[in-house]
Amino acid sequence: MLLGFVGLGAVVETAYLPAIRKFFDTPPHCLGFDIQPVKQPEGVTRCSTLSELLSQPLDTLFITTSSLHHLEVLEQALASSVSRIVVEKPIVATLPQTEKLNALLASPDAASRVLALDHWMARIETVKRSLVGNVSDIVKIDGFLQEPSGYNAAGEPIALNFATGEPDARTLRHPDGVILDIGTHVLAMLRETVRYLGGNDEMTLRVVTAKDRLGRDIAKGDLTTAEGEAHLQGSISGVPVDIWLNKYAGPDGGQKGLRIYLRDGRIINHDRRGAEDVLELINGDTRQCWKIPGTIYEHCLAEHILGVNSLFERDPHEVSRTTRRRIEEVTLLLALQQQLRGPH
């Protein structure tokens, strides 16, 4: 197996490569290209140009650049012979890009080759363990991604690297706020769960609150400041949802998942704790608990992309449908940005 990566940043080094090493007894050969020569993660052989990488007999190509550059790389990849192209979230970064992407994927041949990835779409343990019979059994769902954070010398909150826990040196700017950057994760997990329970693709969302890193409201016309926290509210397949996003939740942060409230009074809580997912079924004073070890990327790559029963193999038509759902989610989140900040 020969894998290719365009963009060799932190997500490749801290998420993809460890998951690949865990999955394969003998790791596959990996090739990569990045416009920054200093980026050379261990286990990846660099190509000097993107064209050189795309000319190789790749089994799967991963597009892991910054989101603003996903589309331009995807266009070149579709012009090559690579048959499986996986694009990191969000698949695009602006509304004009979504229009161009939709035109690009209007061809069934192109659409069948492209999988828009959000690794949280593999977090469907509620479905796998048959804890809910049908979407009609659900009263409401809370989705949440509350990232732990630290403090700088001035006592201001600072983001931490999701994999290492070290301070994130980047200065985050719009559109890299929580609505698009991590809202995609929660929305993908919620929609996939609801879909498998018999729900449809209908969804609505509005911004209840959006604040910057220091807790100040995002002002109309502000096209620079990234949201540090946000509360979104709406519905998915008619089920009321609240989504809570916070990149600066302090030392008590770390909650990552969903909470489902059932009509019979039971509550399902799916969270991330340490190196494992934890699923709980709460019925009054009774609590059942299941633990799912391994990283989310390990499960997603194994179940959807690299395994013998990958989505490309078991249900080729679902590849384009999955991508369509991820595009719908990104489009909605980008539209929320327009409403929050004004047209841009």
Predicted regions and their residues:
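C-terminal helix-rich "cap/oligomerization" subdomain common to oxidoreductases
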Residues: 60-62, 198, 209-211, 303-344
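A contiguous active-site-proximal alpha/beta segment in oxidoreductase catalytic domains
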Residues: 60, 91-159
